Amino acid sequence: MGHLPTGIHGARRLLPLLWLFVLFKNATAFHVTVQDDNNIVVSLEASDVISPASVYVVKITGESKNYFFEFEEFNSTLPPPVIFKASYHGLYYIITLVVVNGNVVTKPSRSITVLTKPLPVTSVSIYDYKPSPETGVLFEIHYPEKYNVFTRVNISYWEGKDFRTMLYKDFFKGKTVFNHWLPGMCYSNITFQLVSEATFNKSTLVEYSGVSHEPKQHRTAPYPPQNISVRIVNLNKNNWEEQSGNFPEESFMRSQDTIGKEKLFHFTEETPEIPSGNISSGWPDFNSSDYETTSQPYWWDSASAAPESEDEFVSVLPMEYENNSTLSETEKSTSGSFSFFPVQMILTWLPPKPPTAFDGFHIHIEREENFTEYLMVDEEAHEFVAELKEPGKYKLSVTTFSSSGSCETRKSQSAKSLSFYISPSGEWIEELTEKPQHVSVHVLSSTTALMSWTSSQENYNSTIVSVVSLTCQKQKESQRLEKQYCTQVNSSKPIIENLVPGAQYQVVIYLRKGPLIGPPSDPVTFAIVPTGIKDLMLYPLGPTAVVLSWTRPYLGVFRKYVVEMFYFNPATMTSEWTTYYEIAATVSLTASVRIANLLPAWYYNFRVTMVTWGDPELSCCDSSTISFITAPVAPEITSVEYFNSLLYISWTYGDDTTDLSHSRMLHWMVVAEGKKKIKKSVTRNVMTAILSLPPGDIYNLSVTACTERGSNTSMLRLVKLEPAPPKSLFAVNKTQTSVTLLWVEEGVADFFEVFCQQVGSSQKTKLQEPVAVSSHVVTISSLLPATAYNCSVTSFSHDSPSVPTFIAVSTMVTEMNPNVVVISVLAILSTLLIGLLLVTLIILRKKHLQMARECGAGTFVNFASLERDGKLPYNWRRSIFAFLTLLPSCLWTDYLLAFYINPWSKNGLKKRKLTNPVQLDDFDAYIKDMAKDSDYKFSLQFEELKLIGLDIPHFAADLPLNRCKNRYTNILPYDFSRVRLVSMNEEEGADYINANYIPGYNSPQEYIATQGPLPETRNDFWKMVLQQKSQIIVMLTQCNEKRRVKCDHYWPFTEEPIAYGDITVEMISEEEQDDWACRHFRINYADEMQDVMHFNYTAWPDHGVPTANAAESILQFVHMVRQQATKSKGPMIIHCSAGVGRTGTFIALDRLLQHIRDHEFVDILGLVSEMRSYRMSMVQTEEQYIFIHQCVQLMWMKKKQQFCISDVIYENVSKS
């Protein structure tokens, strides 16, 4: 035997063999058998052999691959059979025989199909089918799953004396529900076989597994009896006395033939499962003879049974109801007056519903839950009669049992139980079957609640209110805060007392009549709201932490404290209550928590609530709050500089993330304390101050951050100011031997030292000791007559000398020289003449100013309409302009400058430059004049500005490829001044961006005015920033204003870098103020990196101007940008939305701020005209044009104030 193909012979025979499989269908006879060990044995018969030279091959298919086997070569005897070990049990295999003579097929082949036997079931479990144990079972079988194939399961069993078998296929994971058996039947010898089936050539093969598991047996539950009912009959007294001697002492009942009165009772209680009780071996037979009655019977029918509920209440009954001591007064009087006469109980029922196999009934009679009688009757009995010899509460139940066969005896499920009460007087009391309805709770206070309910029955005489705490068991015993209702407490009062605030309770109501108690009501759950905390206190621990402490009520139950805080969150820009911490409840009456990581100088509101265990949770109380403003952090003085008697102080506050815009910081208090104490209050947005301090003193400098409720002071900075030299030193009262020196003290000085020495003598003469004086005058004596001296006065403060102040003095000669008298007279006359000349000049100056106001400041004449084309030489124009600058500003008009500006040239509108210089000393009067008649003269000037640049071309902006790059179709860049991008793309328009160069105070391309980027142009915008090496971007708009998009958000939202084309932008830092924000960007392109500052002014309305009160804010912003620009290279990029209105106003203010620093005149008209010749519509509205004038007025006012503060006059003393 061998496998094919093998070696050379296998290769030689493979192709004919495959051809044979396709060609032939007829068969040669051969024999195939399947052994028990799953081996397939294939053997040749004598009739199969054609010649010993032929090759016989077997092909076996059925598994994932085909197998080929070759019979061994043989001569006179048949070859041994081929044995194939099948891997699968229960799988069909196809065996094909092929005969090959040499390389030629000489005999057709044929196929035989065999089916292997599946592996048997190893174990079986049978369970009741809980929804229907009378007819249903759950089968669970276990069998080998690997390599085991079957289609159905054969179930065999004996049903009583009948043998049954069936094929079942609805097994899932070895389990199935079979719901077709008979109730109460014993099913024995239950076995399971796996069945495998296969169909081949219209024939079906079937194989059964063996049975290797232990046979099982199972009895289904019988149905319970039907229509169980009982009647109670009062026996005739005489009959009872005759038979009283036959009562068994050990039993509370016996049989009785004589029947007195009978009554019909209706019991509707469900019966619990019958417990094992004492079976009475001497139970009397029931009597089925005729009964003598004295009244119409009343039947208790069980058809209207109530749900099973009485057994649930057994464990919660009060102890007082477990014996007969709880009988009513009527019952007690009855039992005291009469002896109990037994009553007759007649119990009847009907057989269970067919088909049910049963062998009898079990009767269970229970009295007072302590005494039990348990007996059995056959299947023919349907009535049971017994005498009840003792009063009490009785419970009856009847069940069906089945015992025939080899299975265990089994009872039916419990049917309905019947309950009633027999009083000592023989009176029966019907069981209560209705539960209370509409149970509700009304909480009267934090410790009291009132229960209410409704009931249709009126035959109950009391109620039981059962209360239990649901929260008590949720607490650890060591931390338990309540004791009263941890176990169930019963009461007959509708009012529940001694409740605990915060606890949750469950209440059940029962109706009671005598010892009988009805079914419970639906449970009602209610909770008592906690009373909340008390004495909430706050203790600050610095700028960023506080401690909260509080006490809780002595009486109360809760799960946890929840500490919340309310504040403005600068990260989310919202204010809301957030939970900070939760503290588990303890028995301690006090609690505290430390709250850290607070923002300094910030308003907080803290709240502590008590949360209960209930579901849902209750909390109290929102009024337990306390507010607080944290202290600011201490500022840090960073620089102190002193010059010109002014001390310049700078400081920082917090770190880069500290937010002042939303804090409760009010102002800074800068204090310099020396011999004098100088204070200055500084607004919170400014961190610099200038103090005018007298020199010569030692000062302790401090900066205090002040809020509404607290402050924090920086570390003291010691500053020692050197004493200043005396001011205005004079020599008076000169004599031949003495001179008096007089000076003015400058700053603080402890004393002054005076020295005098002779001039021009080889022998230096000076005072033996310096004269130290504390006053401002000293007389130097013992001088030589007619001698010149150099005297000096030095201030001393804190042992430090100042720079000495010198004066040359000469003593008087002994006799008066006549020439001196003449010279003195001439000097006096000259002084009078000079004074008269000064008075005359002052009068002329006033008249000149009056003439300037009358002629009208800023008047200009438009010669644009004149048809004249004349040009003057350049030198002439310079001379004219130089001459005009000498005239009063009221004469600086377009009329006089007509030849200089040359409006009649060929390119007049393009090159025309309107101008109107104004002296700053006259600027206030100029503004008043221009603002007359509703800003009429401003309107005239602005109308002239509209003519600038009308004929300047902008062809690139009109190209079809570039139109989509323009935010507004009427704001287009001029070709001659537009910014051109460097692009590798040679496509037309690739270099276009809506931006123009604007000349500045320092450079002809100091600014780039551009529109707010669009989503399509943000990449071009960053390319322009990189190529122009711009380090400052000024954004004068918000991305969205009045629900309209004004500009794309072209920078990253977070610190995560974002790629804009080939350029990556990363936001390094961001700082926001009330009116602006400063951002630091880092842009990267290949190996090139550049830092860019982004200044965003957010308080500027579109097409408008900031309010008059906000003018100082915008000037401060312009000054801040200018300070940064002096440190930067490349043009500043300025944009708003269109890039003309707010952009032009900002550029004008920045240029004027620099111009006024160095000059005392301005030409606003000429400046705006020049900007409009480089980009259209710069300074877009008349309001913006007027706003520039108002800002210039403010600039000049501040410059004059600075001059007044720093104007320290030193008088030079001439030589005598």
Curated annotation (Swiss-Prot):
- What does the tissue specificity note say? Glomerulus of kidney. Also detected in brain, lung and placenta.
State the compartments where it is located.
Membrane
- Keyword annotations for this protein? Glycoprotein, Hydrolase, Membrane, Phosphoprotein, Protein phosphatase, Receptor, Repeat, Signal, Transmembrane, Transmembrane helix
Disease entry from the Swiss-Prot or TrEMBL record: Nephrotic syndrome 6: A form of nephrotic syndrome, a renal disease clinically characterized by severe proteinuria, resulting in complications such as hypoalbuminemia, hyperlipidemia and edema. Kidney biopsies show non-specific histologic changes such as focal segmental glomerulosclerosis and diffuse mesangial proliferation. Some affected individuals have an inherited steroid-resistant form and progress to end-stage renal failure.
Parts of the chain on the Cytoplasmic side: 844-1216
Write out the GO cellular component annotations.
apical plasma membrane; axon; dendritic spine; extracellular exosome; GABA-ergic synapse; glutamatergic synapse; growth cone; lamellipodium
User: PROSITE patterns, from UniProt?
Assistant: FN3, TYR_PHOSPHATASE_1, TYR_PHOSPHATASE_2, TYR_PHOSPHATASE_PTP
Which residues participate directly in catalysis?
Answer: 1136
Question: Can you tell which superkingdom this protein's organism belongs to?
Answer: Eukaryota
Query: SMART domains, per this entry?
Result: FN3, PTPc, PTPc_motif
**Transmembrane segments in this chain: where?**
823-843
The residues forming the signal peptide are 1-29
Report the protein name in the record: Receptor-type tyrosine-protein phosphatase O
Which species is this record about? Homo sapiens
Known glycosylation sites: 75, 154, 189, 201, 227, 278, 287, 323-324, 370, 461, 490, 700, 712, 733
EC number, as in UniProt = 3.1.3.48
Membrane topology classification: Single-pass type I membrane protein
According to the UniProt record, list the residues that bear Phosphotyrosine: 1210
> Which GO biological process annotations does it have?
axon guidance; cell morphogenesis; glomerulus development; lamellipodium assembly; monocyte chemotaxis; negative regulation of canonical Wnt signaling pathway; negative regulation of cell-substrate adhesion; negative regulation of glomerular filtration
Q: What does this protein do?
A: Possesses tyrosine phosphatase activity. Plays a role in regulating the glomerular pressure/filtration rate relationship through an effect on podocyte structure and function.
- Please name one Pfam family that this protein belongs to: fn3
Q: What induces it?
A: By various differentiation-inducing agents.
Identify residues that carry Phosphoserine: 865
The record lists the catalysed reaction(s) as: O-phospho-L-tyrosyl-[protein] + H2O = L-tyrosyl-[protein] + phosphate
The record's subunit annotation is: Interacts (phosphorylated form) with FYN and GRB2.
